[in-house]
Curated annotation (Swiss-Prot):
UniProt domain EF-hand: residue ranges: 39-74, 75-110, 111-146, 154-191
Lineage of producing organism: Eukaryota, Metazoa, Chordata, Craniata, Vertebrata
Protein name: Calcyphosin-like protein
Molecular function terms from GO: calcium ion binding
Protein's gene: Capsl
Chain positions recorded as Ca(2+) 2 binding sites: 88, 90, 92, 94, 99
Localization of this protein: Cytoplasm
Length: 208
């Protein structure tokens, strides 16, 4: 994705800086994820998804804590408890991790969300609600990538690196859900100040 490597570095530095003063548990977790770059929040989502053995999309506190530890999130148990309780609104002892990830995403304008979903729909050729790696390969324009432009990477390397953003090293299922796509671009979005630049970047990369 054109320009995102630089944005990623800047965002990581800014996030680490903000982390030293942030007190809200949600903000602190969000910053820890963003300090890893655009794919940080999506990566945490993958960890939770792998742990969700029975596919009910919920986690109890023990699983939640294990997920944070597996993702090497630095957080006191008390802070994790406070975070968990905020999402366990009905006091059932479980949280819906989709709702949790939704809150964790950096806020985005409607215009940004619309262009992200427009790109998703274009890529989802079969209309079955998931994008396959093959779908991406057909549409993603690698020639806009700065490392391709300066001769550092081949087109194939750009694809591989880009697809790695969507696929977890522990769970390479080759499928990208709307949530994963949105989580990834919420991270990219956090590093880009203006809607106009974000929309131009999406339109160019996905030929919208």
């Amino acid at each position: 994705m054109a320009g995102t490597a630089r944005h990623d570095r800047e965002m990581a530095i800014q996030s680490k800086k903000k982390l030293s003063t942030a007190t809200d548990p949600i903000e602190r977790l969000r910053l820890q994820c963003l300090a890893r770059g655009s794919a940080g929040i999506k990566g945490l989502g993958r960890v939770f998804r792998i742990m969700d053995d029975n596919n009910n999309r919920t986690l109890d506190f023990k699983e939640f804590l294990k997920g944070l530890n597996d993702y090497a999130v630095v957080m006191e148990k008390e802070e994790a408890e406070e975070l968990f309780q905020r999402f366990d609104r009905d006091g059932s002892g479980t949280i819906d991790f989709n709702e949790f990830l939704l809150t964790l995403r950096p806020p985005m304008s409607r215009a940004r969300k619309e262009v992200i979903m427009k790109a998703f729909r274009k890529l989802d050729k079969t209309g079955d609600g998931v994008i396959t790696i093959e779908d991406l390969r057909e549409v993603y324009n690698a020639k806009h990538h700065p490392k391709y432009q300066n001769g550092e990477w081949t087109e194939e390397q750009v694809f591989r690196k880009f697809l790695d953003n969507f696929d977890s090293p522990y769970d390479k299922d080759g499928l990208v859900t709307p949530e994963e796509f949105m989580n990834y671009y919420a991270g990219v979005s956090a590093s880009i100040d203006t809607d106009v630049y974000f929309i131009i970047m999406m339109t160019t990369a996905w030929k919208l």
